[in-house]
UniProtKB/Swiss-Prot annotation:
Organism: Buchnera aphidicola subsp. Acyrthosiphon pisum (strain APS) (Acyrthosiphon pisum symbiotic bacterium)
Known partners and oligomeric status: Monomer.
GO terms for cellular component: cytosol
Name of protein: Isoleucine--tRNA ligase
Residues binding ATP: 607
Binding site for L-isoleucyl-5'-AMP: 563
The organism's taxonomic lineage, starting at the top: Bacteria, Pseudomonadati, Pseudomonadota, Gammaproteobacteria, Enterobacterales
């Protein structure tokens, strides 16, 4: 038997089957860097409409984690897809460079000589540390394949940006939204600083839950009010319930609801006053079996009654009215400590009850609080408080309670409310809160629930505490009068002057500057405020400083913000407040949020659990494209699961896409688009369908990109590669590709289709599988651009004419029939009736309509079903043993083992007769394709 291998057009490519991504990707990155790919893209797109995704600044501290990778990859996918959709989509990476974590890292390094270092020296060390962290993280982000202006990132610590932050605050001062107050704010004992709402996270905490009695000072008034004669031997207690016993030393009043009914209940021990609806529950908790309800009054009648502090001597506490009191739990009365609760503070203000602070910045009671409490940390004081209550006969009940409690997001430790003099932005001044709620309605929130979430936060949020008692941050840059404590009337002008100096020398200027230089002779009357700004104020201001606009950009805001769902109360909120306050406009048109990364069991990533996965480890072992594919495949609107099994699944998807691309590249190795392109009119019908189907898929994929449904992009890609191409089109054209004459129109027709399809496919995957797309692009003949990222979606695809007899409906029916026949063939192979489809004669029993269409295809029909022989008969003529399709109506199939000889060249079976050329063992078709004029194909 002759070897006919040299007569076949076998596929050939250097594009490897294995990705070897971890080895190849660094070289691809080197090419991008050496040729400055980002600038090439921007230059090519410079006249196009801008799409600007504003990068939320990650904190410049520590290695990147898997959450960072998810965020940056999602942004990169969007940027690249927008560039390919005809936009100029710049990407300017940002970093948040000030704040406590950096201070703490520097403090750890200089512990031995901390007292010898000046504030400005300390700030310089912080700046150096932050810059080092930026460089480290930048390297990791670049390794993920994220393309951006890495040489010119936005750093909040750049002098110009520090100055701009001061300018923004000056405008807020000018609009009279800044004020100072002595009110309770979240305070972290480990940070020794105030915290903003965005720096708080809620976790479960075990607390001491106690019920305490506040004795009424004047029994006779209560006796008269309840119209009942009180026993002289029994005290009257207004019961309160609290989970923060340590706040009792700060009690200034007891709040009750004006409209609730409060019952006077006599027990063996004393008289109790409890809200009517909570009496039964409270008595059960106290295990009081014998009691008598003596009378009741509305809460408003108890207003200004005087109670005694439960253990501090000679302190009278008034009963006050507040609608913040509820019947959900407790007793219907709450002790009121304006130092340690915002609602307590607000209600105390109405009664002119002054706020004082008996807890220092370390969380310790100050001197003269109580001889048992002085110097004690408040979080360790509950047991002492309970002892004092027992001693004073005001203790009624104690139990442990596990509940949700605010914690510091950095230290994961419980925080307290502590009253200190701080600076606030007034959220209700000039109807700012109402404007914020109006602006969020103009934003597209993805997912949609983001709008209601941030809306509820805006409705409930307190005024924004923007001051911090630290050193590494932008200074507030204001002076206040030493006596009146009011801001200098020319503060707006002074702040602009200070900002100019900061722009030249950095934030350290404020600590070094002589007040006289700014204030002149007034300097002796004013005090320089050394507080710095909340880092959320800094990051919330970034949208005002990044220069992303050109002549084609007319919007007043960024197109998109994209961050984790925790940023509704963080960066989204701070940016919205500042933008609305300064310009009365929203800072973004779209806000997209993603969930958090969890392990395969749905558990939160935690070092203590040991379930964390480093993005760098994934990149070093599997490659960045696998990580990018995992991100794109995930429904990021929910929490995103990751595990070795999930990454293996991503690798399997990758392998399918890569092998599809490899097959196509291998089959156009001898194809020159300048010479070999076949026009639509002269193409084989199946190739026209393939191009038309590719166009349909491209429209779907573009739509998914536009809607940010990247998992849908992957699903559509997989179906296209596996089903429409892999098990249908590419499978069918192998025969034509390999066995027809090399330069035949029929073969060049399928190569034209492949060329168009791979040109489309490489663009579809470029935003996600960026390294692989770049590699594929390097193997494609006749590229217009150096890099695929400089291209737009492929524009040479065309639709099938819907009026054609063989339209999409026909081909969809054929695909379905082919899948059905494949099932029957697999069954026959398993039963060892046949070995493969080519040694099978297939008889199709179909409807008149389909029979007429298939007969037009004549002998080419067999190539669709990869068989050596096919017969088309009417459905009604099918024998009883024909297999009936459960999916396709009017379809029955009979399979018979074919008779004849197997052609050693094309592997089809044929009847060997004397008509065959002498000494030839190949079929007539192969004879035509080797020494003849070539086989003709019209349809398949």
């Amino acid at each position: 038997m002759d070897d006919y291998k040299d007569t076949l057009n076998l596929p050939k490519t250097l594009f490897s089957m294995r990705g070897n991504l971890s080895k190849k990707e660094p070289n691809i990155l080197k090419s991008w860097n050496e040729n400055n790919l980002y600038k090439l893209i921007r230059k090519k797109n410079q006249e196009k409409k801008i799409f600007f995704l504003h990068d939320g600044p990650p904190y410049a501290n520590g290695n990147i984690h898997i959450g960072h990778a998810v965020n940056k990859i999602l942004k990169d996918i969007i940027i690249k897809s927008k560039n390919m959709s005809g936009f100029d989509a710049p990407y300017i990476p940002s970093w948040d460079c000030h704040g406590l974590p950096i201070e703490q890292k520097v403090e750890e390094k200089i512990k031995s000589n901390q007292g010898e270092i000046s504030t400005t020296e300390f700030q310089e060390k912080c700046r150096k540390y932050a810059q080092d962290q930026v460089e480290k993280q930048k390297k990791d982000f670049i390794r993920l394949g994220v393309i951006g202006d890495w040489d010119n990132p936005h750093l909040t610590m750049n002098f110009k940006n520090e100055a701009n932050i001061i300018k923004t605050l000056s405008k807020i001062v000018q609009k009279k939204h800044l004020y100072q107050d002595f009110k309770p704010i979240h305070w972290c004992l480990k940070c020794a600083s105030s915290l903003s709402e965005a720096e708080i996270e809620y976790s479960k905490k075990k607390s001491d839950s106690i019920i305490v009695g506040f004795k009424f000072k004047y029994k006779s008034i209560i006796e008269k009010l309840f119209d009942f004669q009180i026993s002289n031997k029994k005290e009257i207690h207004l019961l309160i319930w609290t989970t923060t016993p340590w706040t009792l030393p700060s009690s200034k009043a007891i709040s009750i609801h004006p409209d609730f009914q409060y019952q006077l209940i006599e027990t063996e021990r004393c008289y109790l006053i409890i809200a009517k609806e909570l009496v039964e529950k409270t008595l059960n908790t106290l295990k009081i079996k014998k009691s008598i309800i003596r009378n009741y009054v509305k809460g408003r009648f108890l207003e200004k009654m005087i109670c005694l502090h439960p253990f501090l001597k000679n302190i009278d506490l008034p009963v006050i009215l507040g609608k913040h009191v509820t019947l959900e739990s407790g007793t219907g009365a709450v002790h009121t400590a304006p130092d340690h609760g915002l609602e307590d503070y607000i209600i105390s203000q109405k009664y002119n009850i002054k706020t004082s602070n008996i807890v220092n910045f370390k969380g310790e009671y100050i001197s003269n609080t109580h001889d048992k409490l002085d110097g004690v940390n408040v979080l360790e004081a509950n047991s002492i408080i309970i002892e004092l209550l027992i001693k004073n006969n005001t203790f009624f009940h104690h139990e442990s309670l596990i509940h949700s409690y605010p914690h510091c997001w950095r230290h994961k430790s419980p925080v307290i409310y502590r009253a200190t003099p701080q600076w606030f932005i007034d959220i209700d001044q000039k109807q700012l809160r109402i404007k914020l709620l109006q602006e969020i309605k103009k934003v597209r929130w993805i997912p949609e629930w983001g709008e209601s979430r941030i809306g509820e936060m805006i409705k409930k949020r307190p005024d924004w505490c923007i001051s911090r008692q630290r050193k590494w941050g932008v200074p507030m840059s204001i002076f206040i009068h030493k006596n009146t404590r009011k801001i200098h009337p020319n503060t707006f002008v002074f702040m602009k002057k200070i900002a100019k100096k900061v722009e030249l020398e950095g934030l350290q200027v404020w600590w070094n500057i002589d007040s006289k230089e700014i204030l002149g002779e007034e300097y002796q009357s004013y005090e320089k405020i050394l507080d710095i700004l909340d880092v959320w104020f800094e990051s919330g201001n970034t949208h005002t400083t990044i220069n992303y606009k050109n002549k084609n950009y007319t919007k007043k805001n960024a197109d998109m913000f994209l961050e984790g769902s925790d940023q509704h109360r963080g960066w989204f909120m701070s940016s919205l407040i500042i933008s609305t306050l300064i310009s009365e406009k929203k800072p973004y048109s779209e806000v997209l949020t993603h969930g958090f990364v969890v392990d395969g069991k749905g558990q939160k990533m935690s070092k203590s659990i040991g379930n964390t996965i480093s993005p760098n480890e994934i990149v070093d072992t599997l490659g960045a494209d696998i990580l990018r594919l995992w991100v794109a495949s995930s429904n990021y609107s929910n929490d995103i699961s990751i595990s070795n099994e999930i990454l293996k699944s991503s690798s399997d998807i990758y392998r399918r896409i890569r092998n599809t691309a490899r097959f196509m590249l291998a089959n156009i190795s001898d194809f020159d688009p300048k010479k070999n392109i076949i026009s639509k009119e002269n193409m084989v019908l199946l190739d026209k369908w393939a191009i038309g189907q590719t166009k349909i898929v491209q429209e779907e994929i573009i739509q998914h990109y536009n809607n940010y449904n990247f998992h849908a992009v992957i699903q559509r890609l997989m179906y296209f590669c596996s089903i429409e191409m892999g098990s249908f089109y590419l499978d069918i054209i192998k025969d034509r590709q390999y066995t027809l004459k090399k330069h035949s129109q029929e073969r060049r027709s399928s190569q034209t289709a492949i060329y168009y399809i791979i040109n489309s496919l490489v663009r579809w995957i470029a935003p996600i599988l960026s390294f692989t797309a770049d590699e594929i692009w390097s193997y494609l003949p006749e590229n217009n651009s150096q890099y695929v990222f400089m291209e737009e979606w492929f524009d040479k695809l065309f639709y099938l004419d819907q009026d054609d007899l063989f339209n999409y409906q026909f081909w969809n029916e054929i695909i379905t029939i082919k899948h059905e026949i494949n099932k029957f063939l697999e069954e026959a192979i398993q039963n060892k009736t046949i070995n493969n489809s080519l040694e099978t004669s297939i008889i199709l029993y179909v409807s008149h309509e389909l029979s007429n269409k298939l007969k037009i295809l004549e002998q080419e029909t067999k190539f669709i079903f990869l068989t050596s022989d096919i017969q088309i008969k009417l459905y009604d003529t099918a024998p009883k043993n024909a297999k009936k399709s459960k999916i396709v109506p009017y379809l029955k199939v009979s399979l018979e083992k074919i008779k004849g000889k197997k052609c050693p060249r094309c592997w089809h079976y044929f009847n060997f007769t004397k008509k065959n050329i002498k000494n030839s063992d190949i079929c007539n078709r192969c004879i035509l394709n080797t020494i003849g004029n070539g086989e003709k194909r019209i349809f398949i």
